[in-house]
């Protein structure tokens, strides 16, 4: 059974919801996820129901609320009421779209995103404000062109400046932003192996996050990429910059060029 589509329905035909987890504010996480999913769909990052996005309500009354797009939904048709909400403390499910009126759900049974444990890892280990998972073709191609290597590397490209320079503060054991990467810096992104089920990637993702304190992303071979940032707009910028660099790297590699200047 397919998920219901309300993308073209007049608002008057959609029942009003008395839901404390939703808002008319365009900057509310549930609304932003829908907006970004449409943008990402147009970029071929979340086609065929693939990929996902989650946002932590860092500017709301409870910054531990995490909004997550459901599994198996056409991302360009996503509606705010279709969000799952999870409490970061204890990872308790607070809201499910299955609680909405049947007028909306059409008896469709929504499932939480299979990315949920991976998103939670980014929030708990990096204090992220948003996490994006795409099936970017450039990301997949890079993991193939790099063979069995466990790191993607590129340097001396102007777009690297859009990414943060991070380091581990050993006294606090926290990752801190110390500025932006520079033109001559080398970007390193860990590559982990894919698994038959998304949630089975969790341990590998956590290990990569621990071993690469300077990264804001993890590539998954033959699958895609996870990107996070301190808020949703930073995560968006990082994702766009990384996809640019990955696409460029594919072209450089196929042209026989090194992606890292010797």
Swiss-Prot record:
Substrate binds at residue 115. Belongs to the aldolase class II family. MtnB subfamily. It comes from Meyerozyma guilliermondii (strain ATCC 6260 / CBS 566 / DSM 6381 / JCM 1539 / NBRC 10279 / NRRL Y-324) (Yeast). Catalyzes the dehydration of methylthioribulose-1-phosphate (MTRu-1-P) into 2,3-diketo-5-methylthiopentyl-1-phosphate (DK-MTP-1-P). Its cofactor is Zn(2+). GO terms for cellular component: cytoplasm. Keywords: Amino-acid biosynthesis, Cytoplasm, Lyase, Metal-binding, Methionine biosynthesis, Zinc. This is Methylthioribulose-1-phosphate dehydratase. The gene is MDE1.
């Amino acid at each position: 059974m397919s998920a219901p589509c309300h993308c073209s329905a007049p608002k008057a035909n959609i029942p009003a919801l008395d839901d404390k987890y939703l808002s008319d504010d365009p900057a509310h996480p549930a609304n932003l996820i829908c907006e970004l999913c449409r943008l990402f769909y147009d970029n071929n990052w979340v086609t065929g129901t693939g990929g996902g996005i989650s946002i932590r309500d860092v500017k709301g009354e409870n910054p531990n609320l995490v909004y997550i797009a459901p599994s198996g939904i056409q991302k360009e048709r996503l509606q705010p009421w279709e969000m799952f909400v999870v409490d970061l403390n204890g990872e308790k499910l607070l809201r499910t779209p299955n609680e909405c009126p049947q007028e909306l759900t059409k008896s469709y049974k929504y499932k939480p995103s299979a990315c949920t444990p991976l998103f939670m890892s980014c929030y708990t280990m990096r204090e992220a404000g948003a996490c994006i998972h795409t099936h970017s073709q450039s990301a997949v191609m890079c993991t193939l062109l790099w063979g069995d290597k466990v790191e993607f590397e590129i340097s001396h490209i102007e777009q690297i400046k859009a990414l943060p320079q991070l380091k581990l503060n050993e006294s606090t054991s926290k990752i801190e932003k110390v500025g932006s990467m520079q033109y001559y810096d080398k970007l390193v992104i860990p590559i982990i192996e894919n698994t038959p089920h998304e949630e089975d990637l969790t341990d590998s993702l956590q290990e990569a996050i621990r071993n690469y304190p300077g990264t804001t992303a993890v590539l998954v071979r033959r699958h895609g990429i996870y990107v996070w940032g301190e808020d949703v707009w930073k995560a968006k910028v990082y994702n766009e910059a990384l996809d640019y660099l990955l696409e460029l790297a594919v072209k450089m590699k196929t042209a026989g060029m090194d992606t890292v200047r010797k």
